């Protein structure tokens, strides 16, 4: 009986800070409020199809020397039948661009685990167009389906910027990415955006994958007025600054978010959503784990997130209801002791001070407040 009582007490203590309505620095949803935020509501009527890796219409490493060549071939066949691209285990130093196409693609690693198949490149946002062309230009010809994506980056002046730093870029709907690793290996001690995966389309599925990088690892949704839904399951995502960011509707279920400290240890931010203020659904983290390097356990300087106020130059230029207002729910997940528990959210990219709504009666989409919420999380950082 004593053991049972102690265990129950431990559970209560671990979840004590998850009591609704929370505090102004850490708002918590009530049970009834949390019912508005489920996988189904974020999917918004989409039923993701099952994923199969039992066939291969194209094989990279046996018939195709690059992933891009296999993607081009699949798109050029036309039609609306799903095409399957198998990537044999190995390391591929290249970019992969999937332009808008009606051909649904499944791209999967042929190894026994996602670590066996790695797509990697060192390509930060500060890369010059000439260096970019030297890195990836050999992959593209003017008649290729994705040439316009390449050319838009190659023709930039100065540097290529955040979007063009992407290693794996998806602009087509209904793409499935399975059992592989995508890495942008760029690393320095300052601010250096370097995107591993970017999705600018709808109905994207990422399963059993690894997304590796530091700053801006995953760019999930462009923030356009169109619907951009993506569904991540059993996927590992690592980084340090804003390493999950963007304006799409993204569901992360049974995923791991790992905060690294090998590049910088002064601060870290996991999520930076850029949700349109008229959209109710941004990022949904469900039954997942947020953890990281031991350096954050002692300093407690890592933050769960901040708002990416894209296009807003300063806090005084922010207009509630017009400017972006990132939306994020973390629900029934484990948050390790790497997070500043008393203040897990930090100042927006515009300089706008974080403002949480812990009123007993509240509008969860009131744009005078940040739209960051938690429900029924556990762990030393909850």
UniProtKB/Swiss-Prot annotation:
Gene source species: Sitophilus oryzae
UniProt record, GO biological process: cell wall modification; pectin catabolic process
Enzyme Commission code(s) on record: 3.1.1.11
Function: Pectinesterase which probably plays an important role in the digestion of plant cell walls.
Pathway assignment: Glycan metabolism; pectin degradation; 2-dehydro-3-deoxy-D-gluconate from pectin: step 1/5
Region forming the signal peptide: 1-16
Residues binding substrate, per UniProt: 193, 306, 308
EC primary class: hydrolase
Keywords attached to this entry: Aspartyl esterase, Disulfide bond, Glycoprotein, Hydrolase, Secreted, Signal
Name under which the protein is recorded: Pectinesterase
Lineage of producing organism: Eukaryota, Metazoa, Ecdysozoa, Arthropoda, Hexapoda
């Amino acid at each position: 009986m004593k053991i049972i009582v102690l265990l129950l007490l431990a559970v209560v203590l671990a979840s004590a800070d998850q009591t609704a309505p929370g505090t102004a620095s850490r708002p918590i949803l009530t049970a009834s409020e949390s019912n508005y935020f489920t996988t189904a509501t974020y999917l918004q009527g989409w039923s993701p199809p099952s994923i199969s890796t039992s066939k291969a219409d194209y094989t990279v490493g046996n018939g195709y020397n690059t992933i891009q060549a296999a993607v081009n071939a699949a798109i050029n066949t036309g039609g609306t039948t799903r095409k399957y691209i198998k990537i044999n285990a190995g390391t591929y130093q290249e970019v992969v661009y999937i332009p808008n196409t009606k051909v649904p693609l499944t791209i999967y690693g042929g190894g026994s685990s996602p670590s066996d198949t790695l797509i990697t490149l060192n390509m930060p946002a500060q890369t010059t167009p000439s260096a970019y062309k030297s890195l990836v230009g050999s992959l593209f010809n003017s008649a290729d389906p994705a040439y316009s994506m390449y050319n838009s980056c190659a023709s930039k002046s100065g540097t290529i910027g955040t979007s063009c730093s992407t290693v794996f870029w998806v602009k087509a709907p209904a793409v499935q990415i399975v059992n592989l690793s995508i890495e942008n290996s760029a690393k320095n001690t300052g601010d250096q955006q370097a995107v591993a995966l970017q999705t600018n389309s709808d109905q994207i599925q990422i399963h059993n994958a690894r997304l590796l990088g530091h700053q801006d690892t995953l760019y999930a949704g462009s923030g356009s007025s169109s619907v951009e839904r993506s569904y991540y399951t059993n996927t590992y995502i690592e980084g340090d600054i804003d390493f999950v960011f963007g304006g799409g509707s993204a569901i992360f279920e049974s995923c791991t978010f790992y905060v690294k400290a090998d590049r910088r240890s002064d601060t870290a931010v996991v999520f930076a959503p850029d949700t349109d203020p008229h959209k109710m659904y941004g990022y949904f983290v469900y039954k997942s784990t947020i953890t990281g390097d031991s350096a954050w356990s002692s300093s407690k300087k890592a933050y769960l997130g901040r708002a990416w106020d894209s296009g807003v130059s300063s806090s005084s230029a922010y207009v509630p209801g017009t400017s972006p207002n990132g939306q994020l729910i973390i629900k029934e997940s484990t948050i390790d002791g790497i997070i500043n528990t008393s203040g897990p959210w930090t100042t927006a990219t515009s300089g706008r001070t974080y403002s949480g709504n812990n009123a007993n009666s509240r509008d969860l989409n009131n744009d005078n407040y940040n739209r960051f919420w938690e429900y029924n999380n556990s762990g030393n950082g909850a």
